[in-house]
């Protein structure tokens, strides 16, 4: 029998091209991280350079080439013979869910790692009526933890809504819109202040502790959409092709890590406000892709349909 580590089987030549194209970022994200490390200096020397750098690029390229070869070896005979109608599935839906998990779980991993510093820096000058500084490293950590803690409620809710709204595609699209607006809200927490030592400072959009409370509420609402979308993504995956659920889930899950890697590299190059705008744009692009590529699963609610 075929091992589950084998590449996916696809239904058409067009799907094969899509699969190979969507497989590259799984390796490409590692290349981007390697490139970023080659630009990080410690004691005046890059973390990785010269032949070790090119060796990593070479190994990653070989991994992708081997994947392409194996994919063609498995799929070309099947496609030449013709795929039976009952075995066909819509690969565009797999690609669409890769994009949603990139934009939701990828964003979550990236944001959780930068959120404590964002709150600590943005609200560093906020003082209580007694003149004490309110924002401490501990408080900023608690606020950031609330973003992740919402997961306990939000992710199951995303799956539940996908089950109850009777249209899994519409649920997914609604969540992606919510993420886009959520991160636009996050971007509005701070505004550009002065430049200190060549670094762009971000200060609160409004003064006072009330704005800090509102900022925390914006953060939690954004997190509700981000993590609900993760639940909604995995509510669709088993509906695409039942006997390939593991492989489809594995690829979508990997795209979450690709998203985190790409977003964190971007974060190392831009300020926090721009970073939130970029994540919002990522969710908007995923929405557009899903709108055109994601098919409502035909038997998603079989008992109602037949």
Where are the predicted features?
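Residue-level signature of mid-helix packing/kink "hotspots" within the transmembrane helices
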Residues: 148-156, 257, 261
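Symmetry-related core transmembrane helices of the 12-TM Major Facilitator Superfamily/SLC fold
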Residues: 19-28, 49-66, 274-292
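Cytoplasmic membrane-interface "Motif A"-like loop-to-helix N-cap segments
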Residues: 163-177
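Extracytoplasmic gate region of multi-pass secondary transporters
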Residues: 23-54, 92-145, 230
């Amino acid at each position: 029998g075929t091992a589950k580590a084998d590449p996916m089987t696809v239904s058409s030549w067009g799907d094969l091209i899509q699969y190979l194209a969507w497989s590259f970022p799984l390796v490409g994200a590692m290349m981007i991280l390697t490139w970023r490390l080659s630009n990080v200096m410690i004691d005046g020397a890059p973390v990785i350079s010269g032949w070790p750098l090119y060796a990593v690029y070479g190994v990653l390229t070989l991994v992708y080439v081997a994947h392409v070869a194996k994919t063609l070896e498995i799929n070309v005979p099947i496609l030449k013979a013709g795929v039976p109608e009952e075995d066909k599935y819509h690969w565009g839906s797999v690609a669409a869910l890769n994009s949603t998990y990139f934009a939701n779980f990828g964003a979550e991993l990236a944001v959780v790692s930068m959120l404590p510093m964002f709150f600590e820096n943005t609200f560093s000058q906020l003082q209580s009526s007694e003149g004490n500084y309110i924002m401490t490293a501990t408080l900023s950590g608690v606020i950031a933890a609330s973003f992740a803690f919402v997961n306990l409620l939000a992710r199951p809710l995303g799956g539940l809504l996908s089950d109850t709204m009777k249209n899994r595609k519409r649920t997914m699209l609604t969540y992606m819109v919510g993420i886009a607006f959520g991160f636009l809200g996050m971007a509005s927490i701070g505004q550009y202040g002065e430049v200190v030592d060549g670094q762009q400072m971000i200060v609160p959009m409004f003064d006072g502790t009330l704005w800090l409370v509102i900022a925390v509420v914006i953060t939690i609402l954004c997190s509700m959409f981000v993590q609900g979308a993760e639940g909604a993504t995995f509510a669709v995956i088993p509906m695409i092709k039942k006997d390939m659920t593991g492989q489809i889930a594995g690829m979508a899950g990997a795209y979450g890590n690709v998203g985190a890697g790409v977003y964190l590299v971007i974060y190392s190059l831009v300020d926090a406000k721009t970073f939130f705008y970029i994540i919002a744009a990522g969710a908007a692009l995923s929405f557009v892709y899903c709108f055109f590529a994601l098919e409502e699963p035909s038997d998603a609610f079989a008992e109602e349909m037949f």
